[in-house]
Regions:
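Mg2+/Mn2+-dependent nuclease catalytic core
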Residues: 110-135
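A short acidic/basic microdomain associated with nuclease active sites
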Residues: 42-77, 83-85
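C-terminal tail/extension regions appended to the core domain(s) of diverse proteins
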Residues: 1-29, 39-50, 72, 118-122, ...
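Residue-level detector of short, conserved catalytic/binding motifs and their immediate flanks
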Residues: 80-82, 103, 146
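Short amphipathic alpha-helices and their capping/turn segments at secondary-structure boundaries
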Residues: 82-96
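Conserved catalytic cores of phosphodiester-cleaving nucleases, focusing on short active-site segments
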Residues: 84, 101-112
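Eukaryotic short linear interaction motifs
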Residues: 93, 112-114, 156-159
Length: 278
């Protein structure tokens, strides 16, 4: 419980730091990388303050699930890669094989869909929360809690929560509830208790930290789909630029083409007449 509390505190501060950056990338993986750097900075500052809020173990970024003592041979879950995991040694654990535990954190974007097939608020459930209950993914195995981070890029929080919970119910998962100390400026904490039939221990407490990043990406009227289209525009411009350069290199303007040809022709005639007139 103490490790969870410290991890959540560090990530809450790191998300605030992320939100205050002058610019941010749009894509999930790039946001995760920025958040990783923020979390390390926050943890370093807390360790220097020496108030017992920092964590001396290393935060792991995009690392595979570690082997679990209950798995006698290598399993599929060991090939899965959570966004973050923060290990610790549970000294209260009687079994030395089970003393090493990992707090797993998965991150997803939240808001309106970027396309008809990529729906963020559904993806948060299907490719996020479910990884903590699906044995093939096995996130949080042998741990009592884990976390999800949501990057809000547009839409209001209440509308997002309704859509996420609608998708959770359709996947036979419990609702996410606003935590008692949930709403802070730009950061919202929510809680969810999962029953895990095929992963121990159960029940499992999944914490949710949602950060409001809308101010980084858009005018109030723009959707995620419009943002995605704008992000792709520079690539089209570069393509045009390359085409133009190719055109300039391979097909000079007509006047430039005609002049060298006339000059070359005269040059050849001159040489011929010089050869005929010693």
């Amino acid at each position: 419980a103490n490790h969870e509390k410290r991890v959540l505190n560090i990530f809450t501060l790191a998300l605030k730091m992320l939100s205050e950056k002058p610019t941010l990338p749009l894509e999930e993986n790039n946001l995760n990388r920025e958040l990783y750097l923020c979390a390390n900075r926050v943890n370093g500052m807390l360790l220097k303050e020496n108030r017992g809020q920092g964590i001396e173990s290393t935060l792991m970024y995009e690392s595979k699930n570690q082997p679990d003592p209950d798995d006698k041979t290598r399993t599929k879950r060991e090939d899965k890669i959570p966004d973050f995991q923060w290990g610790f040694c549970d000294c209260k654990e009687a079994d030395p094989d089970r003393m090493t535990k990992y707090f797993i954190i998965e991150s997803k974007r939240l808001g309106s869909p970027s396309s008809s097939t990529w729906i963020f608020n559904k993806n948060y459930v299907v490719n996020g929360i479910k990884r903590f209950v699906d044995p093939e993914w096995g996130y949080g195995k042998s741990s009592h809690s884990g976390a999800m981070i949501g990057y809000i890029q547009d839409m209001e929080l209440q509308n997002i929560l309704e859509e996420v919970n609608t998708n959770a119910v359709s996947e036979l998962l419990p609702d996410i509830q606003l935590s008692s100390d949930g709403e802070q400026p730009d950061i919202t904490r929510l809680d969810q208790r999962l029953e895990r039939e095929q992963i121990q221990p159960t029940p499992f407490d999944l914490r949710h930290l949602w950060v409001d990043l809308k101010h980084h990406y858009q005018d109030k009227d723009k959707t995620n789909q419009q943002i995605e289209e704008e992000v792709s525009k520079p690539k089209q411009t570069n393509k045009k630029s390359r085409t133009t350069n190719k055109s300039k290199g391979g097909e000079p303007p007509e006047e430039e083409v005609s002049k060298p040809k006339q000059t070359n022709k005269k040059s050849r005639n001159t040489k011929k007449s010089k050869a005929g007139e010693p």
